Amino acid sequence: MNYKAFTQIAIDLLSAKLCNCTQAIMTHIIASFLAFMFF
């Protein structure tokens, strides 16, 4: 398990709530998840 990836996602979720830009954050999370799957 890559704990750094989960930590990054948690930070992204917190950032989404703080700046209210959930669409951009979700796009970043999806991109990060795809990168995690392929690498």
Curated annotation (Swiss-Prot):
Q: What are the inducing conditions?
A: Expressed in both exponential and stationary phase; expression is higher in exponential phase (at protein level).
* Chain segments annotated as transmembrane: 13-35
GO cellular component, as recorded: plasma membrane
Which is an annotated Pfam family here? YkiC
The molecule here is called Protein YkiC
Give the UniProt subcellular location, in the record's own words.
Cell inner membrane
What membrane topology does the annotation report for this chain?
A: Single-pass membrane protein
Q: Which UniProt keywords apply?
A: Cell inner membrane, Cell membrane, Membrane, Transmembrane, Transmembrane helix
**Keyword match Oxidoreductase:** no
Keyword Membrane on this protein? Answer: yes
